[in-house]
């Protein structure tokens, strides 16, 4: 897992966000991706470490992005939609 800064959060609908990550130059190769790959994100929510995987939904030209839809009682998806902010730090595993 590597700490990546959230460079942008776009509210697509009332229940979904597009999260863009800033990948440091030194990690560009590690975070290269192909269509169909996903990212595993990890953060602490209410003092518990929570990890979820989301499909990458961008082209290489758009940078590293995932879309997250809020689901009922979804701990991570609710947190992502309601609490994450631009410039927050998120632990992210390289694409898989």
Report residues per predicted region.
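Ferredoxin-reductase
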Residues: 1-88, 93
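FAD-binding core/adjacent interface of flavoenzyme oxidoreductases
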Residues: 96
């Amino acid at each position: 897992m590597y700490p990546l800064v959230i460079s942008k959060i776009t509210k697509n609908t009332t229940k979904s966000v597009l999260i863009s990550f800033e990948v440091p130059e030194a990690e560009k190769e590690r975070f290269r991706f192909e269509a169909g790959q996903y990212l595993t994100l990890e953060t602490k929510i209410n003092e518990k470490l929570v990890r979820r995987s989301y499909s990458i939904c961008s082209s290489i030209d758009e940078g590293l992005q995932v879309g997250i839809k809020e689901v009922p009682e979804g701990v991570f998806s609710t947190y992502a939609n309601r609490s994450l902010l631009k410039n927050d730090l998120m632990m992210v595993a390289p694409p898989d």
